[in-house]
Structure formats: structure tokens, C-alpha cells
Amino acid sequence: MRMRAFARRCARELLRDPLNLAFGLGFPLVLLFLLSALQRNIPVPLFEIDTLTPGITVFGLSFLTLFSAPLLARDRESAFLHRLYTTPMTAPDCILGYLLPLLPIALMQAAVCYLAAMPLGLTVSLRILWAVLGMLPMAVFNITLGLLCGSLLGVKQVGGICGALLTNLSAWLSGVWFDLELVGGVFEAIAHVLPFYHAVALEKALFAGDFTLAATHLLPVTLYATLATAAAVWCFLGQMKKQ
């Protein structure tokens, strides 16, 4: 009950910044339309709409860190968390309270991307539903990674870390903009170790209906989501003990 009340409070805080939400939802659409237009003039297999849309959807999830990190950082720098520490809520309760309001935003973001791609020629099938649901582990990873940053850094710092570093990591290491095999070497090896490439491959496999391939990419993404959540809880617990 307390956790649900806290989650509702976090949802209200997120809705107080509609410009940030609009940017998170709108910027992936701008990229989708621009790259789709580029594909019509200079055909590139990587930018075909059925291949591009799953990748853009996953890239858009990186903006979830821009929602979760500043929210926690602001609470940490204010007196709010000091009051929260005096309640019976545990660290997992608090992390869930921050996490749960952002999951519907992630689902809406993915749904909007796929809906916007339909007039551009996206193949419409029930597999879109699986693709939308399949991005949830990566959404959890991005949200809890933002919470981890918010637990350790100030409001000004998380803007640079989450707004620049993490979004660029997602862009360059996911294979959305270029085929990682063309670069090869250490760069490709690093990309395959991190979750961004696997999240895009998972989304593409689900959209294509290849559930066997999807399962191979689901494991590393889920593992990273679990580790990020555990790290966020551990850091939040450390902050509670300091207070």
C-alpha cells in the first residue's frame, strides 16, 4: 500500500515536466521519419522500415534514464528523501516506487513508434504486440540505471551522464545506425558484451516472429536488468544507512 502511494506520487512528479516527456516520446519519432525518408532516396537495407522500427524503439528507451535519474537526484538533494527514510518503506519498495510509473511510459513510447511506422509501410501483424512487450527488460535496465545514477550523482551531473553518455552508448553500441560487423574487432566484441545490441536483436527477432533467436538475446538483457536493479537497490540502501 505504501509503495503504491509512493509510486503515484512519483507519477505526479513525472507529469509535472511534460516537455521532458514530450521530448522522450517525440525525438525517436523524428529519427524514424528522417531515416525513413533517407531510405526512400538512398536505399539502405538497415534502414528498411521493418528493420529500423525495432531499433528506434530500443534507442528511445535510453531516454528513460533522463526521467528516472533526475527524479531521484532531486529527491535526494531535497528534504523529501530524509522524510522517506523515516517511513517503514524498504529500499526495494522505494526503487519499485520509482520504477513502476515509468513502465507505462516505456510501453506507450514503444507503441507510438510502431503506430507511427505503420503509414511508412511497416508490416502489421500481432507480432508487434510481442515486440512491444519484449522491450520491457531493456526498459527496466534503463530506468534502474538512471536510478543508480540518481543515487550517486547530483541533478546537474545526471543530466550530462544520462543525457549524453548513456544515450550515445545506446546509439553507437546497439547496431541501429550501422552494421557492427562492418566495424568488427574490439568494438564489435564490446557491443556484444553490453545489453544494447542484444536488446535491438531481441526486438527485431520478436517482430520477425523468430522466438528461438529472441530467447538467446533475452537472457543477457534480463541479466543486465537484474544487475542494474540490484545495484540501484544496494546504492539506495547505502544512502538510507548514511542518513
Where are these regions (language model features)?
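Hydrophobic alpha-helical transmembrane segments of multi-pass membrane transport/permease proteins
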Residues: 13-41, 49-69, 103-108, 168-171, ...
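Transmembrane alpha-helix boundary and packing residues in multipass membrane permease domains
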Residues: 32, 36-37, 114, 118, ...
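Residue-level recognition of membrane-helix boundary sites in multi-pass small-molecule transporters
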Residues: 19-20, 93, 158, 189
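Short cytosolic juxtamembrane segments of multi-pass membrane proteins
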Residues: 236-243
